[in-house]
């Protein structure tokens, strides 16, 4: 009798994706982050669903409804902090996942990579709108500042901003629609994830050598299911330590003050995972220029396949580009730090230097390094 997992129309799909999937025998723990991101998405959808049962998207009651969840709902505090810190864990995994993709040249699987870039934008949009929902000071002013950036678009900017706001300022209409979008987007993200996996399984996974691994494949289960489970345990341990011992460490104290349109906080800043992009935005004095730089700081990922000059796929055996890569990582950490600092000397000039370095390394230095390495190895 044929095994049901190989014949049943539905189970067969799961079998080909997670059980009998041929996987390279040498993929390292850097390949764990895909499954960890799936776990993060599941946690966010579940905790978000329970929060939505008690939350009210009205400017008069939004803040107090979040307080009510934390004080009066059974384990409401846990659900709320799991959701808030779950977003941070999500972005940590995302950044590591993208970083792995850049290091090992996974961007050469163009459909999978572009789907991933779209996913990154979708997750960032979802997180931004979620941050607005508690209706604290930083929620309100963050929403005001970031949506107002669209007014830099020539001709249609002002109209577009008022259309998104549903009025002449961030108000009840804005909060209601942000809640609606924040609720629906994770399900759209789930659909996009399936497409991402569909494209990945067309080509098969990359591996640390960057070489073709068709000659040496092993089944996904039990090898990588067990390996992924170890990653899951480590992630959950870190997640629960963060949630139960340091729930507010990544948040902003200003968000415990109800939104007040008449009182601007001294330093408006987004959550930590947007600070690098916020620093790039602020480092350009011109409004439209800043917005373009902000979008390009993420969109530049889609250009990576075009900027790949090396005859080798991964950075494993390319010391010059490796050096550039780690300088880029350090540069992103500097940008993240600068994004949380006030706009004054010396932070302005550090931010501008780091922003120029970010684009220079990706657009100029890494492609040149690739060509130099080809020359050294006589690969051209």
From Swiss-Prot:
Q: InterPro entries of this UniProt entry?
A: Cyt_b/b6_C, Cyt_b/b6_C_sf, Cyt_b/b6_N, Cytb/b6-like_sf, Cytochrome_b, Cytochrome_b_C_euk/bac, Cytochrome_b_N_euk/bac, Di-haem_cyt_TM
State where a ubiquinone binds.
201
Q: What's in the GO CC field?
A: mitochondrial inner membrane; respiratory chain complex III
Positions of transmembrane segments: 33-53, 77-98, 113-133, 178-198, 226-246, 288-308, 320-340, 347-367
Q: Which UniProt keywords apply?
A: Electron transport, Heme, Iron, Membrane, Metal-binding, Mitochondrion, Mitochondrion inner membrane, Respiratory chain, Transmembrane, Transmembrane helix, Transport, Ubiquinone
Q: Does the keyword Ribosomal protein apply?
A: no
As to how many cofactors bind and how, the note says: Binds 2 heme b groups non-covalently.
Give the top-rank taxon of the lineage listed in the UniProt record for this protein: Eukaryota
GO terms in the biological process aspect are: mitochondrial electron transport, ubiquinol to cytochrome c
Q: How does the entry describe its membrane topology?
A: Multi-pass membrane protein
Keyword Ubl conjugation assigned to the entry: answer is no
Q: Where in the cell is it found?
A: Mitochondrion inner membrane
Question: Pfam families of this UniProt entry?
Answer: Cytochrom_B_C, Cytochrome_B
Gene3D superfamilies, per database record = Cytochrome Bc1 Complex, Chain C
Binding positions (heme b b566): 97, 196
**Which cofactors does this gene product need?**
heme b
Q: Which family does it belong to?
A: Belongs to the cytochrome b family.
> In the UniProt entry for this protein, what further remark is given in the free-text comments?
Heme 1 (or BL or b562) is low-potential and absorbs at about 562 nm, and heme 2 (or BH or b566) is high-potential and absorbs at about 566 nm.
**What the protein does?**
Component of the ubiquinol-cytochrome c reductase complex (complex III or cytochrome b-c1 complex) that is part of the mitochondrial respiratory chain. The b-c1 complex mediates electron transfer from ubiquinol to cytochrome c. Contributes to the generation of a proton gradient across the mitochondrial membrane that is then used for ATP synthesis.
Q: How does it assemble?
A: The cytochrome bc1 complex contains 11 subunits: 3 respiratory subunits (MT-CYB, CYC1 and UQCRFS1), 2 core proteins (UQCRC1 and UQCRC2) and 6 low-molecular weight proteins (UQCRH/QCR6, UQCRB/QCR7, UQCRQ/QCR8, UQCR10/QCR9, UQCR11/QCR10 and a cleavage product of UQCRFS1). This cytochrome bc1 complex then forms a dimer.
Q: What is this protein called?
A: Cytochrome b
Q: What is the lineage of its organism?
A: Eukaryota, Metazoa, Chordata, Craniata, Vertebrata
């Amino acid at each position: 009798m044929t095994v049901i997992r190989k014949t049943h129309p539905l189970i067969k799909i799961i079998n080909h994706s997670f059980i009998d999937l041929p996987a390279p025998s040498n993929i390292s723990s850097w390949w764990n982050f895909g499954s960890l991101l799936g776990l993060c998405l599941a946690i966010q959808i579940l905790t978000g669903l329970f929060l939505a049962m008690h939350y009210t998207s009205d400017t008069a009651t939004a803040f107090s409804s979040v307080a009510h969840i934390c004080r009066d709902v059974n384990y409401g505090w846990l659900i709320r902090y799991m959701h808030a810190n779950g977003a941070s864990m999500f972005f940590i995994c995302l950044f590591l996942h993208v970083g792995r993709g850049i290091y090992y040249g996974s961007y050469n699987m163009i459909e999978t990579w572009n789907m991933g870039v779209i996913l990154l934008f979708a997750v960032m949009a979802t997180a931004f709108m979620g941050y607005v929902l508690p209706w604290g000071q930083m929620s309100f002013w963050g929403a005001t500042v970031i949506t107002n950036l669209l007014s830099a678009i020539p001709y249609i900017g002002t109209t577009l901003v008022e259309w998104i706001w549903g009025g002449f300022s961030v108000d009840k209409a804005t909060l209601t629609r942000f809640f609606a979008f924040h609720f629906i987007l994770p399900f759209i993200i789930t659909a996009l994830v399936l497409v991402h996996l569909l494209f990945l399984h067309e080509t098969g996974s990359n591996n640390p050598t960057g070489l073709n691994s068709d000659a040496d494949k092993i089944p996904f289960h039990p090898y990588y299911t067990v390996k992924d489970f170890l990653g899951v345990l480590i992630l959950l341990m870190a997640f629960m330590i963060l949630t139960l011992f340091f729930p507010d460490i990544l948040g902003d104290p200003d968000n415990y003050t109800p939104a007040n349109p008449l009182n601007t906080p001294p330093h408006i800043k987004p959550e930590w995972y947007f600070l690098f992009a916020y620093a790039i935005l602020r480092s350009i004095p011109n409004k439209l220029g800043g917005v373009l730089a902000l979008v390009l700081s993420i969109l530049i990922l889609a250009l990576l396949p075009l900027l790949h000059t090396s005859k080798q796929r991964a950075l494993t055996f390319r010391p010059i580009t490796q050096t550039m890569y780690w300088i880029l990582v350090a540069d992103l950490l500097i940008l993240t730090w600068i994004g949380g600092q006030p706009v004054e000397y010396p932070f302005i000039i550090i931010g501008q230097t780091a922003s120029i370095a970010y684009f220079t390394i990706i657009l100029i230095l890494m492609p040149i390094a690739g060509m130099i390495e080809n020359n050294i190895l006589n690969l051209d």
